[in-house]
């Protein structure tokens, strides 16, 4: 795994601090980015899991969008962009479309259409984690924005994983599907302003 550390703490950019971070969180490789903003060039093409950790406004989302846009359509496979909230999904969809990327947004479909498989009719989909039970296909690239908040949805507030119409609990199904998708994908990009040991352990335990 690799961590791209941004300028969210000046002292973090010191060599010693980076070394401490790596040892504390069992990270095999780190890359400190001293520029103010991240870019697509900062994302390692050869490593399956990349964690982009930086302050808000450091261009995490923008760098990932450009990274994906550079990959030839026929070789990148299907792309899944997961978020913890509807609002963040809507914002991301607009940014992707502004970048010229054709994307399917789950709020643009009815529950009936999603159950019929229309959510995955395109090869680039964006939705919040609670709708994961509608998916069946594998994905070459998976992006998780605000990964810590996304993991939190699997905690005590399981009500967030209820079916929007039937109110059926989808928590177990969503989590099982979540692990399956991450295990099978070729590239996993995680983004947040901070990363906990729980997230690092989860990624390592996927036996990638």
State each model region's role.
Residues 46-66:
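Walker A/P-loop
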Residues 81, 125-128, 143, 186-193:
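Structural recognition of the conserved hydrophobic beta-strand(s) that form the central parallel beta-sheet
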Residues 136-190:
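SF2 helicase catalytic motif II
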């Amino acid at each position: 795994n690799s961590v791209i550390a941004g300028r969210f703490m000046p002292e973090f950019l010191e060599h010693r601090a980076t070394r401490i971070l790596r040892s504390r969180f069992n990270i095999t490789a780190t890359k400190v980015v001293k520029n103010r903003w991240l870019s697509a060039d900062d994302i390692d093409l050869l490593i399956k899991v990349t964690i982009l950790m930086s302050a808000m406004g450091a261009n995490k989302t923008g760098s990932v969008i450009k990274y994906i846009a550079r990959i030839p359509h026929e070789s990148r496979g299907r792309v899944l962009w997961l978020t913890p909230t509807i609002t963040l999904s809507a914002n991301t969809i607009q940014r992707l479309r502004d970048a010229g990327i054709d994307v399917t947004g789950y709020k643009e479909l009815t529950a009936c259409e999603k159950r019929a498989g229309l959510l995955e009719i395109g090869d680039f989909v964006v939705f919040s984690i609670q709708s994961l039970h509608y998916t069946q296909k594998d994905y070459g690239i998976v992006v998780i924005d605000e990964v810590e908040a996304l993991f939190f949805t699997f905690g005590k507030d399981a009500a967030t994983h209820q079916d929007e119409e039937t109110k059926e609990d989808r928590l177990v199904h969503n989590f099982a599907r979540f692990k399956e998708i991450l295990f099978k994908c070729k590239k996993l990009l995680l983004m947040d302003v901070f990363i906990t040991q729980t997230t690092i352990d989860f990624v390592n335990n996927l036996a990638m």
